C-alpha cells in the first residue's frame, strides 16, 4: 500500500464530506469541490476521518490510492484556507491589472492581453508588476498561473518575462567576441 494512502485525511470542523459511489464532495467556507475518484480506490468515512485503500488485485491501485488521498487532502485544505500563487512580471513596460473576472496584461506585444479567469479563481494586483491568484481548487489555480506565465515565460539572458515568485531563473552569459 502507498505510504501516502496509509495516512488518513482528518476532516476539520466546518467541513462537510459527502461520498456517493466514487464521487466525493467537500463543502466548506470557501465553497464546494467535487471530484470523481478512480474505481480502484476504496474510500471509507469514519466520524471525522477519511481512509483510503487500494482494491485487491487491481494493477496500479496502490498508486491510485495515494493520488486520491493527496487530491482529497488538497480539497479539504482548499475549502478551509484556500491556495494562492504569486506571479511577478520582470521587464521594462510589463504591467498587470486586475479587472474583475479577468487580468489585463501588457507584456511587450503590439496588443494588450486580457486573460479571462475561470469560475472559482480570483486575482488581485498589489503592484503593477505582481499578480496574486487565489482559489480553493489547487489544480485549477496552478493551471491558470501556468497559462498566464506561458504568455511570456522568463528568457535565459536577461530573465525578462512572467515568473512565479519563488522561481529561480538561471541566466546565461552573453556570447563573447
Swiss-Prot record:
Q: Name one GO molecular function term.
A: rRNA binding
Gene Ontology biological-process entries: cytoplasmic translation
| Classification via Pfam families | Ribosomal_L6
Query: What are the record keywords, sorted?
Result: Ribonucleoprotein, Ribosomal protein, RNA-binding, rRNA-binding
Q: List the disulfide bonds.
A: none
* Coiled coil segments of this chain: none
Q: Which GO terms describe its cellular component?
A: cytosolic large ribosomal subunit
SUPFAM superfamilies assigned? Ribosomal protein L6
* InterPro entries documented for this protein: Ribosomal_uL6-like (IPR000702), Ribosomal_uL6-like_a/b-dom_sf (IPR036789), Ribosomal_uL6_a/b-dom (IPR020040), Ribosomal_uL6_bac-type (IPR019906), Ribosomal_uL6_CS (IPR002358)
Which family, according to the similarity comment?
A: Belongs to the universal ribosomal protein uL6 family.
* Main function: This protein binds to the 23S rRNA, and is important in its secondary structure. It is located near the subunit interface in the base of the L7/L12 stalk, and near the tRNA binding site of the peptidyltransferase center.
Subunit (UniProt): Part of the 50S ribosomal subunit.
Protein's UniProt name: Large ribosomal subunit protein uL6
The organism is Tolumonas auensis (strain DSM 9187 / NBRC 110442 / TA 4)
Upper lineage is: Bacteria, Pseudomonadati, Pseudomonadota, Gammaproteobacteria, Aeromonadales
Quote the gene name from the UniProt entry. rplF
Amino acid at each position: 500500500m502507498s505510504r501516502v494512502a496509509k495516512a488518513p485525511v482528518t476532516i476539520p470542523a466546518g467541513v462537510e464530506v459527502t461520498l456517493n459511489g466514487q464521487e466525493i464532495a467537500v463543502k466548506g467556507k470557501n465553497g464546494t469541490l467535487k471530484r470523481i475518484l478512480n474505481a480502484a480506490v476504496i474510500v471509507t468515512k469514519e466520524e471525522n476521518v477519511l481512509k483510503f485503500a487500494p482494491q485487491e488485485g487491481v494493477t496500479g491501485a496502490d498508486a491510485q490510492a495515494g493520488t486520491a488521498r493527496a487530491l482529497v487532502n488538497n480539497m479539504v485544505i482548499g475549502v478551509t484556507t484556500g491556495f494562492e500563487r504569486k506571479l511577478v512580471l520582470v521587464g521594462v513596460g510589463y504591467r498587470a491589472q486586475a479587472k474583475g473576472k479577468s487580468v489585463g496584461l501588457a507584456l511587450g506585444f503590439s496588443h494588450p492581453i486580457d486573460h479571462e479567469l475561470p469560475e472559482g479563481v480570483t486575482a488581485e494586483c498589489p503592484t503593477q508588476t505582481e499578480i496574486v491568484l487565489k482559489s480553493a481548487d489547487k489544480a485549477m489555480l496552478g493551471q491558470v498561473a501556468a497559462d498566464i506565465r506561458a504568455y511570456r515565460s522568463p528568457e535565459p539572458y536577461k530573465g525578462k518575462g512572467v515568473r512565479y515568485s519563488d522561481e529561480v531563473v538561471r541566466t546565461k552569459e552573453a556570447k563573447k567576441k
